[in-house]
Amino acid sequence: MGLDFAVDQLYSTGWSALDTRGCGRLDDGRAYPEPGRVEGEFASMGFGLTIKHIQLFDCYRAEWRDSDGSAAGSVVGHTIDEAAVYALSQMRRATAAVAV
């Protein structure tokens, strides 16, 4: 997938980097939220986020749960930033679909 793809997916949800605190930058200059900020964005939406390194596959798994502790979604990425950003894009898509 790659971090570029994850950032593309996040921007396609309407996410904006107006506040760049807690953000990294891609080579093309686009800002993206780093894992600590992503955790905060999940918390503000009522979800808990955990990101774990899966040594066997050398990847990261991001999983989020609702306030009841029920699994709400998960993604994998090659890096922790990729997994965090892609998880945020998927959570934003899911919550936008529910709101419609």
Task: List each language-model region with its residue ranges.
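N-terminal cationic amphipathic segment used for targeting or macromolecule association
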Residues: D4, Y60, D81-V85, A97
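Conserved aromatic
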Residues: Y32, S74-H78
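A short, charged, amphipathic alpha-helix used as a generic interaction element across diverse proteins
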Residues: H78-R92
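N-terminal segment of the canonical double-stranded RNA-binding domain
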Residues: G2-S70
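Residue-level detection of beta-strand scaffold positions
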Residues: R61-A62, G73-V75, A87
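Short intrinsically disordered terminal tails
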Residues: M1-L3, S89-V100
